[in-house]
Amino acid sequence: MKKSRGFALLAFALAVTTAVPAAANASPQPSAACKDVPNRYDLPFSVCDDELFIFAANYKPFESTVEDEQGAATRVFDEIVGNKLRETFPDVKIKYATWDYPVRYEDLKAAGVTPDIVIEDPKNRIDRDLEPMGWVGDLTPDLKKAGIDLNTLNKSAVELTKSRSDGGIYGVPLFIDEHVLLYNKKIFDKFKVKYPEPGMTYDEAFKKAKQLTADDGLHHYKGYMQHPDQYLDFNQAGLYPFLPTTSEEPAPEDVKVDISSDAWKTYVDNLYRFLEIPRNDFTTVTDFFKGDMSQPGHLAMAVDTLSRLNMYAGSELFIEDGDEAAFAEQAKSVDIGVSAIPVLERGATTTYQPNTRAAFIPPSSPKKEQALQIVKWLVSEEGQTELSSHGVKAVLQTDKVVQSFGKAIPELAEIDTSAVYWGENAAISNYQNTEYWDLPLWSVYRQHILRDGGTPEQALSLSQQQDIPNYIKAQSEAGKDW
């Protein structure tokens, strides 16, 4: 979607910090020292030493802008949790920024500015961005001192974050942009097919997909879309491609990978059959609304994220400014239903690995104690209720938090979202003495199956024997370890 970047970034120069005003009788304070951060947009940006700086990246809704906002890409963070956070900590001057609005990691590093809290994707970004910056370290003793109990949080999200940390844990999971099954009731009703329910197996989904890949006059409907890259990456079977070595940080040439086992073949076969349904060709999961299709509302089922659900439901908070009319028009062709993603076998309750965002506190943060208290609040029942009420899946799942889901998003009121917290996320295991590399698993489906026409067995073997070793070698030669 087109961003209102020019105006929004210009506005960013006018007001980038929000804080509760000091009391009228407060004693005069010395002027804070500020560091300017040059950036590719040549817009003024600075961080002062009396500000606690929160920087977020890789959560798409945070990038949403509006033309009349007093700041760039701050409105979603503020609405979801920022305003409540400032209300809770009136004596803390909180400055928030989203990546590329207008600064990036390398801009901050070059200016000698270290965020006090970084909200990031622990799955792929610890090795890629945070470790090279020197912005992560084991928080175990700090969390214990601050009274942050990870045992109360989503176990799979915690385990995922641990798996990317070289000993201990580098961050605290905050929320999950969960994958759910979206379905269009209009298409189900048209072809008289029963709606999906949580606990539906892939076998049952496959049967429905074939029934719903159908024609009605000049209209062709597709039955099912599930992005194959995400299917592998958020591995529902809990499969981990790396084999243990003798070190937590093995050299590139010592990294061992296995994606050709029977378990991997079975898992890849499971989705492969959906791709073989005649005229259910994979394009994009955003076809659920319109995506690449010529007309909206012609895809019966799609696995996508909660942030996409909020957008489809019509929440202006999650829709880019200027796109509201287009979404409203497309919405006329879709009656949204929400279920959990299909399970691998009858009676199972395991969904994808969590699409987590976590809070990281750089070791060199000058406000580490304050940052820990803010993170503690963010994972408290009060903080998690605030997130959940805005259509974001929380990592603390008390009755109050779960029941609050979507209450602050009026557009979700008529949609049954009870499936959001259904089941348990798949968990990573046996990751000790492995080094995570952002492997090109996309080559399995998108290259060797969809483009080359290969079988799952061929695709897995080629990826393991050629694509992955070539990737690791190229990255290593470029001085990268991800």
Label each PLM-derived region with a short phrase.
Residues 38, 339, 389-450, 476-482:
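Long, aromatic- and glycine/proline-rich binding clefts that accommodate carbohydrate-like moieties
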Residues 97-105, 200-206, 281-295:
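Short helix-initiation/N-cap motifs at beta->coil->alpha
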Residues 209, 252-285, 341:
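Glycine-centered hinge/linker elements that transmit conformational signals in sensory
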Residues 320-393:
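Extracytoplasmic/periplasmic substrate-recognition and gating elements
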Residues 130-134, 140, 155-196, 226-253, ...:
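Periplasmic solute-binding protein
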